[in-house]
């Protein structure tokens, strides 16, 4: 079923609710999708923050950095896959203008948090450059998630490996010759 066919009546039918009960909390299908989108983004964000706090941004080699990034990318993919309607929620957040702010706010929240941690590790780096880099790479990782979930014929392991390699190679510029590779 496509997003266009989603209706509050269909939601009521599937959820076992009456329309008045649903309308008490949600005035329309966009409000429902907004809440579902927030829940999905919050779950993904929590996973990324936990990964960062567990040392996800710190590695002693490029291979370790790629492996750590692959771990969080696979986790985010699985969170989306496990949420009922997760792929459809992602599609709606990209396609429906009134839902795009939820996705963008999530991206920027993750990017800010990541940038703060990277600036602690690379204090000589430009705040603006690090923040731009984290926004770009967060968006890239989100696009890779969408690609593998929306296109079942895509080789998920290969797409995940390659996006993680791209991100790690990009971030190695901030290491400035150090032996540590972050993000």
What are these regions (language model features)?
Residues 33-43, 106:
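Alpha-helical DNA-contacting segments of helix-turn-helix folds
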Residues 43-46, 69-81, 136-139, 163-181:
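N-terminal hydrophobic signal/anchor transmembrane helix of membrane proteins
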Residues 48-59, 84-94, 121, 148-152:
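Secondary-structure edge/capping motif, primarily at the C-terminal ends of alpha-helices
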Residues 58-68, 81-110:
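Short secondary-structure transition hinges
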Residues 66, 70, 74, 108-115, ...:
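An amphipathic alpha-helix signature
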Residues 100, 118-167, 178-183:
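Hydrophobic/aromatic-rich alpha-helical bundle segments in the mid-to-C-terminal region
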């Amino acid at each position: 079923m496509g997003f266009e066919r989603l209706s509050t009546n269909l939601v009521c039918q599937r959820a076992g609710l009456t329309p008045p009960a649903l309308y008490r909390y949600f005035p329309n299908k966009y409000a429902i999708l907004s809440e579902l989108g927030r829940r999905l983004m919050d779950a993904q964000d929590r996973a990324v923050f936990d990964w960062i706090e567990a040392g996800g941004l710190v590695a002693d080699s490029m291979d370790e950095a790629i492996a750590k990034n692959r771990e969080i990318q696979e986790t985010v993919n699985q969170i989306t896959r496990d949420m009922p309607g997760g792929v459809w929620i992602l599609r709606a957040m990209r396609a429906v203008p009134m839902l795009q702010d939820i996705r963008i706010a999530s991206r920027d929240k993750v990017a800010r948090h990541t940038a703060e941690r990277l600036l602690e590790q690379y204090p000589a780096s430009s705040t603006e450059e690090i923040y731009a880099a984290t926004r770009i790479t967060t968006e890239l990782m989100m696009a890779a998630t969408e690609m593998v979930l929306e296109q079942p014929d895509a080789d998920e392991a290969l797409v995940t490996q390659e996006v993680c390699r791209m991100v790690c190679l990009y971030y190695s510029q901030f290491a400035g010759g150090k032996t540590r590779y972050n993000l």
